[in-house]
């Protein structure tokens, strides 16, 4: 740093002196004696230096070295100071001009000093030789480093001396061998690296010294790649560089000065080398000693040398590798032939039209790996010539927008970016062409040279390769060959003409002879013509030349249009390819009259496209072929023909008009035109216009596929479809491929340029447009639009042509456009698209974008159909109002585009088609057939929850609602709107037609309403009137309303669809309508019958249950002042009813979330609506006696009293009568009581069996225990007598359970309760009746036990294995059941078989009473006995071998009958189990929680957010019947709104109901709560409260919320459904290609992995794992007096009830937690790899790529289906009673959301003993998140007496057990029962450990193993399958002797049948639960209970 500062100081001093003298105008310094100014500036500079040094500003320069380096490089080049960039004099340390002549010694001294200073740059360690020198110093000592430094110094000095002294004999050969120098240096480096890789410190020999010296010497000479480009610009002198010489006068002076400079460099370098040696000997050695001994690092010597050796070796290797690309390939090849690096001639093209390189031999140079044409450049991949022109440019890229305002025709979505041209590249790959040794341009140039004529003339020799003859025959035979070209029919008619034609086209004829022949022949024809000039003006001169042709008959051939088009193409190509040098002519100026007018060829296009029937087509075609060629050669300066003379004459206007008339007359007289008279133009003009219009429409239509034609660039996708998804026969496909490949011209279409017509110089223009419409114009003259006399002349000023073709579909081919296109390609495509990282990001982004939409936001198939029909009808309606039908091409446009571009059409296209065109191009898309969802971008219709609690609401309906309710209040009184059902379609959100209530099924839930106008027209009015009329009549009339109206409306959409298919098939329509109507009526009748049966059961059951239902104090209140409506309906009343109908279903009720998931399907909703309708009708019939009567207040009160008394009498009479007739009831009448009895009998029987079995075993072991068992039996009977109370299971159906003192009753007591106890009044217990019933039951029970008990044989035991009773209640493990006032202790034996003594039992009972306050309502858990794996395998083997045997050989005995009976028994038992679960488990719990679940809401804060579309608004159950008067009066002034169950509306109640349903309405309070809805359309116009203004917006595009959202109580937790309900069919693929850039080869889609279409927007959805989450019902914190009663649920219950005060999972988690370790399907080791059929379909019905493998596939998303129940471990200890009691002590917690977690890594268990916890439970590694406290509001509410043990935190899965804290309240009995905890180890396990013969490894096997490049979703994991290794069998002689011979199974057994049946039972239970847990059923059942409770008591 000091050196640098000193250098800059010296230069700045000199600069300062010069500038100062210049300012004072004093001469510059002539010597070094003027010290005044220098000293002054020197002082200032020293001050500046110290200032910079102490302020540490020099550190800035060090830190900013990466930024300074470019400045240094530029300073070197521009000769400014590197050390100080502020001054302009660079390295002029001393001026050479000072005393140059006067004192040579001073100059020599100056140069010597400059050399010393410049030697600094030579010693900088910038080259490999310096690195090697440094390594020699470090590794091999001072001597080796010194020798290496000398070698480097000698090499540098030699090179500098040879340059400065001008030793050409050395410099020029050495520089010309640059490749040799490079290779020599590289080889030396590689050898050095090889030798020194294992080199250590050693003593040097003389030979090694020379090696070291020579290596560095040669490297310094060869390696100029690092330092010399920079060192050449470094110098401290006034010269440009170090290597520059100095100006001298004579030769001795030259030697002296330059020798002094070189000596200075040598001296400086040698001094620096010596300095380095000194530094290495003293300071560096001391630093090394300090590092190795004293520093804290204390690196050992070996590691020190190892690190240094590694560092230097790698640095040297990096230098060697970095020098590889120093000489490029282009320089290496082109340097020997004299080209400079990056010579521009390498990239130069031959011409603008010919894209070949000028030097074809070096065409492969300067190609990047990602070059846009690298796939088809002939130098890289030699292709056939026809592919090169097609793909040489991306001509479809719209670069013309930047150039002169000419636009391409293609839209932005149809542009092609290379990767979507893969089908084209595939066709190129499939070409039958081998790679040629020579590139294409070489071969083509060779061919053209060989094809030259033998004696070329002077004119053709200049362009030999493209002579006219070569081009002519190449065009003729290679491209436009046709058999008619060679027809020789004309040879017989006119031999001379044929001969001339043959000569003119003969390959042997030279150009000169051909030209002479043609000119003379043409002159002869003109002289012989009868019409003279007029014949020349016409395009068709065959009339004069061949008069015999006029008399021949005109024939039109079918292939005429193709022949003519081929000829047209041929002539057009001849015109462009003819030698232009032969066609030079003088150009004369045209008249300005015609020059001012610009003529477009569109005007002439129709004329040229006319197809005239030619006479004797073959003859005339062959003549035309000749004539077209001859005519081009005719018009040359040499041919002085009459035609040219005539053209050059100027005609006056009058003469020109006469000429036109004569031409027209002659044409009409000599030629018969065949154009139709009625058309202005020939028919083919219109046909061609239509075709062109269709081609345009092809790019804009909504067609799913585009037609694959040769010229159409767009439909690459269809080629993909054909190759990958459709199966064609090979012959047909091969033929088509060959046909397309043969059309070379289509694929060779270049980027076209404008065709320019240049007029001849001396030509007169003839205005014959009228004439040309009727004359027969030769089609082949496309380049001659003004007739046959105008010939295209190509000159220098071709741009000034008059007639220019339109360029709207052309790409401009010019320098500017190509430059723009290339720049766009480089900037956009190469950087953004072709980068692999960006392509990967784009793929992920597109995947995420397509997967961001929830699956539930899709419309259903039927909704899409209905929406499509409505939009179609709406657009058809719009078409009638518009002028489209008067358009010229209306039919074509309508069929191609699909109708007009109205607003509805635009919305439809945007929604259904989307903008997936580019995605279709760039990404693979799976086609699919059938009815599937269509992916849309904007979804106005959401389908989040298919239940009726989260309906959307639009704010515009609010005002109508309030207006309507006011009107309704004034006009209506006792109207029950129940018989009019208004359906809210949960997916389409449209209010359907109100029809009379009946049980009907909905075909399409969106199909009844076609437009909103129908609700406002006469149809709605008629329906409303008929509805009100039916309301005023009796209830029977309402139900018997004709259903035909609705049947027609629901079939409307389906009829439209079928009519569109069979629009003319009337018989089909008739049959279809009759069939559909009959089927619908039949279905309705069946449903009605079924519903009636169910309702009868429900009524009997509810009536029988009267004694258990408490009375409600609510009675209907009626207003006598309001009269019922008359028959004459006023308009106000109709309007009010209209509003109520339209809004009755919009206000949803809050569904209380029960245990079961809220997954419903469409059928459940339909059935539920039908059931509700029936229930409402019957409710109205039973409850609404006073609906149509006019009553005063006194009358209504009297009637109410009488009604209450009567109902009480009737109900009590009914129940007592029912109790008496209970005994006489038939056994088949299976109600709840029957099932309860049956369950009790089964339970008693099985427990008795078990107890007997147990007693026998104990008696065998110890005979003394028999007496003890008798003693306990007597004790039991005493318990029955002493502890028996009035408790019944049916008490759970009571509203008020009698609260007595807590009693603990043995559970065996409860098994002997009387059956009819529930139906007897509690006050009058009939003892005789009870005993009679009991004895009766005992008699029947003993009878059945004796008669029907059958010993099961060993044969029958095999079939019994599938019995469901085995799983139902096989064993009863000890359990605790906590009821409201009762606790039962189940078993009275300990686990060791000993009986509990009386004292122990009493202690445990006392302990239970002490703990009663801590227990929540626990579930009665019955442990299903799980079969061990051994027994499961044994059963499966039996079944497997039996099935195989069944198919091999038939049994002659009764095995077949037994099998059939067994199957029937299994089905019956499955049904029986469902029945049992329904009656015993679900219905009692459901009724019990009915009242408690009437959870209430507090006042909510309502915020008006008009731009949201989703909200869930909870509401409450309404259980008290009121009249409509009550509803309307309290709508705006209530805190609690109660509505009757007959109203199909749900109003939010806002007061807290505790026990009674008496409604108190506080006056004066006006608050309302409104649910949130959405309308059908996405547009909203209304007031936005947050913006404070009126807005009109699209809600889908808005980020704001919309609607009225109700802020829920924070204590409530509302869970939404999982985002995907059902998924599409699983498509399969594997990514097997190994090509890096092979984009979407269809052959790689091998169907091995299952996936589905992932949802959009799943990133923002907080996904909760379904099985890890329990659906919680939280009641309010303040309602402590409301208690939920937990039912005794079925032993086969699927999901246990989860109430708010209990921990749902406690017992299950404790007892069965180890089951998660093992899996059910251990035997599924072989997974069949079946290929699934992936259906295909049109593009618009499937738009998602198939290779998006998602996390949320159904089999992985729902763990119930994925991870089945595990087997418990054999070492699991039976849990004691107190452990369960302790576990039930935990409090319920806040239900946290759970995340997807990674699976546990497999643990290698090498001879490990399984670790057993103290309490006998094995906790798995993969456990649930558990919480222990409940956060209610801001306070922690706990149900424990003890304090909270843990915070409200989730604990992660842990392998450690959560140890329970010892409780001080635990008694001695508890410790006694928990003392015996040791579980004995399996002796087989110990034997295994001793033998050490087997290593047990739990290996995870992947279900699907992805091959190379397989996809896994980001963040997902590959799912593993644990396969258990077989254990060693124990050698047991007795077991072996007892074994039977069994058939060995061939493959692993898959227990599918059992699992599927079990799964189906679960699904049925869920569906039944959901069907009966809906809000409406709750209300109806409650109404029946209220009806019974409110009836007067029996007198």
From Swiss-Prot:
<comment type="function">
    <text>Essential for cell growth. May be involved in binding chloroplast DNA to either the chloroplast envelope or the thylakoid membrane.</text>
</comment>
<feature type="compositionally biased region" description="Basic residues">
    <location>
        <begin position="1853"/>
        <end position="1863"/>
    </location>
</feature>
<dbReference type="GO" id="GO:0031969">
    <property type="term" value="C:chloroplast membrane"/>
</dbReference>
<feature type="transmembrane region" description="Helical">
    <location>
        <begin position="106"/>
        <end position="126"/>
    </location>
</feature>
<feature type="transmembrane region" description="Helical">
    <location>
        <begin position="53"/>
        <end position="73"/>
    </location>
</feature>
<feature type="region of interest" description="Disordered">
    <location>
        <begin position="1418"/>
        <end position="1441"/>
    </location>
</feature>
<comment type="similarity">
    <text>Belongs to the ycf78 family.</text>
</comment>
<keyword id="KW-1133">Transmembrane helix</keyword>
<feature type="transmembrane region" description="Helical">
    <location>
        <begin position="254"/>
        <end position="274"/>
    </location>
</feature>
<keyword id="KW-0472">Membrane</keyword>
<keyword id="KW-0934">Plastid</keyword>
<feature type="transmembrane region" description="Helical">
    <location>
        <begin position="157"/>
        <end position="177"/>
    </location>
</feature>
<feature type="compositionally biased region" description="Basic residues">
    <location>
        <begin position="1422"/>
        <end position="1441"/>
    </location>
</feature>
<feature type="transmembrane region" description="Helical">
    <location>
        <begin position="212"/>
        <end position="232"/>
    </location>
</feature>
<feature type="transmembrane region" description="Helical">
    <location>
        <begin position="307"/>
        <end position="327"/>
    </location>
</feature>
<keyword id="KW-0812">Transmembrane</keyword>
<keyword id="KW-0150">Chloroplast</keyword>
<feature type="region of interest" description="Disordered">
    <location>
        <begin position="1848"/>
        <end position="1883"/>
    </location>
</feature>
<protein>
    <recommendedName>
        <fullName>Uncharacterized membrane protein ycf78</fullName>
    </recommendedName>
</protein>
<feature type="transmembrane region" description="Helical">
    <location>
        <begin position="31"/>
        <end position="51"/>
    </location>
</feature>
């Amino acid at each position: 740093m000091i050196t640098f500062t000193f250098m800059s100081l010296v230069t700045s001093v000199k600069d300062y002196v010069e500038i100062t003298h210049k300012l004072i105008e004093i001469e510059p310094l002539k010597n070094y004696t003027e010290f005044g100014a220098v000293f002054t500036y020197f002082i200032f500079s020293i001050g500046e230096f110290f200032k910079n040094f102490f302020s540490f500003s020099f550190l800035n320069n060090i830190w900013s070295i990466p930024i300074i380096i470019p400045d240094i490089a530029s300073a070197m080049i521009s000769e400014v100071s590197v050390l100080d960039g502020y001054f302009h004099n660079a390295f002029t340390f001393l001026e050479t001009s000072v005393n140059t002549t006067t004192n040579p010694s001073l100059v020599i001294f100056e140069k010597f000093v400059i050399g010393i200073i410049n030697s600094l740059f030579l010693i900088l360690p910038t080259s490999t030789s310096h690195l090697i020198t440094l390594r020699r110093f470090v590794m091999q000592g001072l001597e080796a480093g010194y020798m290496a430094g000398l070698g480097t110094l000698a090499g540098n000095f030699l090179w500098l001396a040879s340059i400065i002294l001008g030793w050409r004999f050395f410099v020029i050969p050495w520089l010309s061998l640059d490749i040799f120098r490079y290779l020599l240096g590289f080889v030396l480096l590689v050898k050095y690296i090889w030798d020194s890789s294992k080199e250590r410190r050693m003593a040097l020999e003389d030979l090694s010294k020379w090696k070291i010296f020579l290596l560095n010497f040669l490297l310094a000479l060869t390696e100029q790649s690092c330092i010399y480009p920079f060192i050449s610009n470094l110098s401290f002198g006034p010269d440009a560089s170090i290597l520059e010489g100095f100006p001298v006068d004579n030769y001795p002076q030259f030697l002296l000065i330059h020798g002094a400079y070189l000596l200075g460099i040598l001296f400086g370098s040698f001094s620096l080398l010596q300095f380095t040696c000194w530094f290495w000997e003293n300071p560096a050695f001391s630093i090394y000693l300090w590092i190795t001994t004293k520093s804290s690092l204390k690196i050992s010597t070996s590691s020190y040398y190892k690190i240094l050796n590694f560092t230097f070796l790698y640095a040297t290797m990096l230098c060697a590798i970095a020098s590889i690309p120093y000489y490029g390939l282009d320089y290496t090849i082109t340097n020997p032939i004299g080209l400079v690096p990056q010579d521009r001639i390498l990239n130069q093209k031959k011409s603008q039209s010919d894209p070949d390189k000028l030097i074809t031999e070096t065409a492969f140079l300067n190609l990047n790996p990602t070059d846009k044409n690298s796939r088809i450049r002939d130098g890289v991949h030699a292709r056939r010539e026809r592919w090169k022109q097609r793909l040489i440019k991306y001509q479809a890229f719209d670069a013309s927008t930047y150039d002169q305002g000419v636009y391409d025709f293609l839209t932005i979505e149809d542009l092609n970016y290379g990767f979507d041209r893969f089908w084209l590249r595939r066709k190129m790959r499939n070409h039958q062409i081998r790679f040629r040794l020579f590139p294409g341009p070489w071969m083509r140039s060779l061919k053209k040279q060989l094809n030259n004529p033998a004696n070329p003339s002077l004119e053709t020799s200049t362009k030999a390769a493209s002579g006219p003859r070569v081009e002519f025959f190449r065009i003729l035979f290679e491209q436009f060959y046709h058999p008619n070209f060679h027809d020789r029919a004309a040879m017989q008619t006119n031999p001379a003409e044929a001969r001339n034609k043959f000569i003119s086209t003969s390959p042997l004829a030279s150009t000169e002879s051909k030209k002479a022949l043609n000119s003379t022949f043409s002159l002869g024809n003109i002289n012989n013509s009868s019409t003279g000039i007029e014949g020349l003006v016409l395009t068709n001169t065959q009339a004069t030349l061949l008069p015999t042709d006029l008399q021949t008959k005109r024939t039109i051939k079918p292939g005429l249009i193709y022949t003519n088009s081929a000829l047209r193409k041929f002539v057009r190509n001849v015109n462009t390819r003819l030698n232009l040098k032969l066609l030079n002519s003088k150009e004369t100026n045209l008249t300005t009259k015609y020059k001012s007018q610009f003529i477009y060829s569109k005007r002439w296009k129709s004329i040229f496209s006319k197809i005239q029937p030619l006479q004797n087509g073959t003859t005339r075609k062959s003549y035309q072929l000749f004539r077209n060629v001859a005519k081009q050669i005719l018009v040359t300066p040499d041919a002085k023909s009459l035609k040219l003379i005539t053209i050059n004459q100027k005609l006056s206007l009058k003469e020109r008009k006469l000429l036109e008339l004569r031409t027209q007359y002659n044409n009409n007289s000599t030629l018969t035109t065949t154009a139709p008279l009625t058309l202005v133009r020939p028919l083919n003009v219109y046909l061609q216009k239509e075709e062109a219009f269709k081609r345009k429409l092809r790019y804009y239509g909504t067609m799913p596929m585009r037609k694959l034609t040769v010229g159409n660039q767009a439909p690459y996708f269809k080629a993909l479809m054909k190759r990958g998804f459709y199966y064609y026969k090979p012959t047909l496909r091969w033929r088509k491929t060959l046909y397309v490949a043969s059309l070379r011209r289509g694929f060779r279409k270049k980027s076209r340029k404008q065709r320019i017509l240049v007029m001849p110089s001396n030509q007169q223009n003839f205005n014959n447009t009228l004439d040309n419409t009727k004359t027969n114009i030769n089609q082949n003259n496309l380049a001659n639009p003004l007739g046959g006399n105008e010939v295209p002349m190509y000159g220098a000023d071709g741009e000034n042509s008059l007639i220019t073709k339109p360029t709207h579909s052309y790409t401009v081919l010019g320098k500017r456009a190509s430059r723009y296109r290339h720049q766009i390609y480089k900037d956009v495509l190469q950087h953004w698209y072709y980068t692999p990282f960006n392509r990967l990001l784009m793929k992920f982004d597109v995947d995420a974008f397509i997967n961001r939409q929830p699956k539930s936001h899709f419309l259903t198939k039927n909704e899409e159909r209905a929406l499509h029909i409505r939009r179609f009808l709406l657009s058809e309606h719009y078409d009638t109002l518009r002028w489209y039908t008067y358009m010229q091409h209306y039919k074509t446009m309508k069929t191609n585009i699909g109708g007009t571009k109205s607003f509805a059409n635009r919305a439809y296209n945007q929604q259904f088609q989307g903008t997936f065109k580019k995605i279709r191009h760039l990404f693979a898309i799976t086609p699919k057939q059938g009815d599937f969802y269509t992916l849309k971008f904007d979804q106005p219709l959401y389908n989040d929850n298919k239940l009726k609690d989260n309906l959307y609401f639009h704010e515009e309906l609010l005002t109508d609602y309030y207006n309507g309710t006011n009107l309704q209040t004034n006009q209506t009184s006792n109207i029950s709107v129940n018989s009019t059902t208004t359906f809210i379609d949960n997916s389409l959100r449209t209010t359907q037609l109100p029809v009379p209530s009946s049980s009907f099924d909905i075909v399409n839930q969106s199909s009844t309403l076609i437009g909103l106008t129908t609700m406002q027209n006469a149809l709605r009015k008629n329906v409303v009137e008929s509805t009100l009329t039916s309301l005023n009549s009796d209830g029977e009339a309402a139900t018997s309303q004709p259903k035909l109206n609705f049947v027609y409306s629901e079939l409307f959409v389906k009829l439209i669809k079928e009519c569109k298919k069979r629009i003319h098939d009337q018989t089909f329509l008739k049959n279809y309508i009759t069939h559909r109507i009959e089927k619908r009526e039949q279905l309705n009748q069946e449903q009605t019958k079924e519903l009636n049966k169910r309702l009868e059961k429900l009524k009997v059951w509810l009536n029988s249950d009267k004694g258990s239902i408490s009375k409600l104090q609510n009675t209907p209140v009626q207003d006598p002042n309001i009269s019922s409506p008359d028959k004459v309906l006023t308009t106000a009343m109709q309007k009010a009813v209209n509003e109520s109908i339209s809004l009755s279903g919009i206000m949803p009720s809050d569904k209380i979330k029960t245990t079961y998931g809220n997954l419903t399907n469409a059928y459940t909703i339909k059935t539920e609506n039908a059931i509700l309708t029936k229930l409402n009708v019957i409710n109205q019939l039973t409850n609404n006696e006073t609906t149509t009567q006019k009553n005063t207040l006194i009358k209504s009160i009297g009637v109410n009293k009488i009604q209450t008394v009567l109902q009480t009498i009737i109900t009590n009479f009914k129940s007592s009568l029912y109790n008496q007739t209970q005994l006489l009831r038939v056994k088949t009448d299976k109600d709840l009581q029957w099932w309860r009895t049956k369950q009790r009998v089964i339970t008693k029987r099985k427990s008795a069996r078990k107890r007997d079995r147990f007693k026998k075993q104990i008696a065998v072991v110890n005979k003394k225990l028999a007496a003890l068992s008798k003693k306990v039996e007597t004790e039991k009977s005493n318990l029955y007598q002493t502890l028996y109370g009035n408790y019944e299971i049916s008490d759970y159906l009571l509203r008020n359970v009698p609260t007595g003192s807590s009693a603990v009753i043995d559970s065996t007591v409860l098994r002997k309760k009387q059956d009819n106890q529930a139906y007897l009044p509690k006050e009058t217990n009939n003892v005789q009746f009870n005993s009679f019933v009991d004895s009766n039951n005992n008699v029947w029970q003993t009878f059945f036990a004796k008669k029907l008990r059958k010993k099961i044989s060993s044969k029958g035991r095999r079939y019994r294995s599938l019995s469901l009773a085995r799983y139902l209640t096989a064993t009863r493990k000890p359990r605790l059941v906590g009821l409201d006032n009762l606790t039962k202790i189940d078993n009275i034996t300990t686990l060791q078989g000993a009986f509990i003594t009386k004292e122990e039992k009493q202690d445990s009972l006392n302990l239970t009473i002490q703990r009663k306050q801590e227990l929540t309502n626990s579930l009665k858990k019955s442990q299903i006995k799980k079969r061990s794996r051994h027994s499961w395998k044994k059963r499966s083997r039996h079944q497997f071998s039996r099935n195989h045997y069944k198919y091999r050989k038939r049994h002659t005995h009764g095995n077949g009958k037994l099998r059939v009976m067994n199957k029937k028994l299994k089905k019956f038992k499955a049904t029986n189990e469902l029945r049992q679960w329904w009656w015993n488990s679900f219905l009692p719990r459901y009724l019990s929680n009915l009242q408690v679940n009437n959870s209430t809401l507090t006042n909510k804060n309502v915020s008006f957010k008009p731009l949201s579309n989703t909200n869930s608004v909870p509401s409450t159950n309404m259980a008290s019947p009121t009249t409509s008067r009550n509803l309307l009066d309290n709508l705006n002034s209530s805190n609690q709104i109660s509505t009757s169950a007959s109203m199909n509306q749900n109003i939010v109640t806002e007061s807290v109901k505790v026990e009674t349903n008496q409604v108190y309405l506080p006056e004066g309070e006006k608050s309302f709560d409104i649910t949130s809805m959405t309308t059908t359309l996405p547009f909203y116009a209304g007031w936005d409260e947050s913006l404070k203004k009126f807005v009109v917006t699209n809600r889908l595009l808005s980020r704001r919320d919309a609607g009225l959202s109700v802020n829920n109580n924070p204590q409530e937790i509302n869970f939404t459904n999982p985002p995907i309900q059902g998924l599409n069919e699983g498509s399969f693929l594997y990514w097997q290609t190994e090509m890096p850039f092979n984009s979407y080869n269809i052959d790689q889609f091998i169907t091995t992995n299952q996936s589905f279409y992932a949802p959009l927007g799943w990133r923002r959805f907080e996904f909760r794992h379904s099985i890890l989450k329990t659906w919680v019902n939280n009641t309010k914190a303040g309602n402590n007096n409301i208690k939920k009663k937990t039912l005794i649920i079925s032993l086969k219950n699927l999901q246990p009830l989860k109430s708010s005060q209990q921990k749902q999972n406690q017992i299950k988690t404790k007892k069965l937690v180890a089951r998660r370790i093992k899996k059910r399907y251990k035997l599924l080791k072989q997974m069949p790899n079946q290929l699934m059929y992936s259906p295909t379909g049109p593009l618009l019905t499937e738009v998602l790529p198939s290779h998006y493998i998602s996390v949320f596939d159904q089999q992985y998303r729902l763990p119930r289906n994925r991870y089945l129940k595990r087997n418990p471990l054999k070492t699991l200890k039976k849990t004691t009673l107190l452990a369960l009691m302790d576990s039930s002590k935990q409090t319920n917690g806040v239900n946290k959301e759970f995340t997807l977690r990674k699976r546990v890594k497999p643990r290698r268990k090498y001879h490990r003993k399984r670790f057993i916890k103290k309490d006998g439970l094995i906790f798995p590694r993969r456990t649930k998140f558990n919480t222990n406290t409940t956060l209610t509001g801001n306070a922690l509410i706990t149900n424990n007496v003890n304090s909270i043990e843990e915070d409200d935190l989730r604990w992660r899965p842990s392998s450690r057990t959560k140890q329970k804290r010892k409780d001080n309240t635990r008694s001695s009995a508890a410790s006694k029962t928990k003392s015996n905890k040791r579980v004995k180890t399996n002796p087989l396990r110990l034997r295994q450990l001793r033998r050490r013969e087997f290593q047990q490894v739990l290996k995870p096997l992947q279900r699907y193993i992805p091959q190379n490049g397989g996809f896994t979703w980001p963040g997902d994991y590959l799912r593993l399958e644990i396969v258990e290794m077989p254990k060693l069998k124990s050698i047991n002689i007795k077991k072996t002797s007892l074994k039977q011979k069994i058939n060995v199974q061939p493959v692993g057994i898959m227990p599918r049948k059992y699992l599927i049946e079990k799964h189906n039972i679960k699904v049925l239970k869920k569906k039944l639960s959901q069907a009966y847990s809906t809000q409406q059923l709750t209300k109806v059942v409650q109404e029946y209970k209220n009806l019974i409770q409110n009836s007067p008591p029996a007198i």
